[in-house]
Design a protein with these regions (language model features):
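Acidic catalytic/metal-coordinating carboxylates
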Residues: 33, 59-62
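The feature encodes the CheY-like receiver
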Residues: 14, 56, 80, 84
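Active-site beta3 strand of CheY-like receiver
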Residues: 44-50, 55
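Short amphipathic alpha-helix used as the core "switch/output" element in two-component signaling
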Residues: 39, 61-73, 90
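Active-site residues of response regulator receiver
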Residues: 8, 52, 80
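Two-component/phosphorelay signaling modules centered on CheY-like receiver
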Residues: 2, 11-29
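AAA+ ATPase active-site-proximal loops
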Residues: 129-147
């Protein structure tokens, strides 16, 4: 089942977003801060992360870098109540899939999650293909010698 991790320090926001995602058929996990995010990522390995920018123990924009370093295949969407251009630009540079303002048309978030989920699946497929290609490279073949006829 496709899964999403929702990170927000406001329980009402987490509950609302979780319900929306569950109605779309996603399995949803929740975290309230950066520390619990890392635990949830390790436990559940979601494909998409929906993360608030302002968290009690850190910043979502910076958290994107950490998440993408540990889990490069997953996609991160940042949500903020007070969006600004510099944060948005930095979020994208850090590897975020998108940066959106809370309260924007809620009808936009469902297709955005769907696109992020598709990209995350594509990322996994590309990783598998790369690993398979590397396993057949000459560097991976060790200890083999030519048979002389």
């Amino acid at each position: 089942m496709d899964s999403i991790l929702i990170i927000d320090d406001e329980p009402q926001i987490r509950k609302l977003l979780s319900r929306m995602m569950e109605l779309e058929g996603y399995e949803v996990f929740q975290a309230a801060d950066c520390q619990s995010t890392l635990k949830q990522l390790k436990l559940h390995n979601p494909q998409v992360v929906l993360c608030d920018v302002f968290l009690p123990d850190g910043n979502g924009v910076d958290m994107v870098t950490t998440i993408k370093k540990l889990y490069p295949e997953l996609e991160v969407i940042l949500l903020t109540a007070h969006g600004n251009i510099p944060d948005g630009v930095q979020a994208i540079k850090n590897g975020a899939f998108d940066y959106i303002t809370k309260g924007d048309d809620n009808n936009k978030i469902i297709p955005l999650i769907s696109r992020a989920m598709a990209q995350a699946k594509k990322n996994v497929g590309e990783k598998v293909k790369t690993e398979e290609t590397q396993s057949f490279s000459f560097d991976a073949i060790k200890g083999l010698s030519l048979i002389h006829i």
